[in-house]
């Protein structure tokens, strides 16, 4: 047990990265197929005797089709369901979508709005289905985050846990001015390897991170990567957050500060709670793109989230 220090060249609070694609290659059919093959073969390890449901919406159809086409080459029991995009994250999908997820051995959900925290998703996993949601996925993010070696990503997760798993305290610094210390306490570290092979298991894709809900945190963290509502920050743009006793006390950016203040009026102190310390382990992600789903997974980066963390072991 002891204290660990992390120095990160790039640092973000729940934000994301832009891989540089040569002209004309973004969304290339071959690249998209390679990424789909990773999801079906490496992540799900789908079997010929299994059933799978690919559920998508009107705005993510090309990604859904790529996943379905690869799945249909593995099993004759592959279902494709498309519906209009929801209005917000966490909105329940239409009943036929929920039924398809629940009745399958495996599911993949590339959708505009997240199905991660829906009754439909949890009911599917409780019924024994294993699967992944891909909220807000784009072809660029799909290729950058899934055309990768997920066995290597899982190994990298284990390496990071070996280094940090027994630490009582973790200090994060970077040249932009981040200097924040987390007390881990008895909180459990989690790993998101993207290997979804056990009945009832669930993940986001692209995957690749280890994370913990810290018991306490104090200091300053400076975001120089991705931060909503701004997306990918400019080269000289940074946002700073002051943290005391596990809560954000000051934010340098007016737009973000207003968002957090509005959330606090609705949910109270949970809006300022320092919810998560995460470390990216996806060795296939070379650059930030401005998508939280991908950027927080980039190997060698650190992300911090504020908000409710009960689902990952917080209070």
Each language-model region and where it sits:
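A broadly conserved detector of short glycine/acidic/proline-rich loop/turn motifs that flank catalytic sites
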Residues: 58, 176, 186, 225-227, ...
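Short, solvent-exposed amphipathic alpha-helical segments in soluble enzyme
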Residues: 67-73, 123-126, 187-189, 237-240, ...
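Short polybasic amphipathic segments
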Residues: 168-173, 239-242, 251, 302
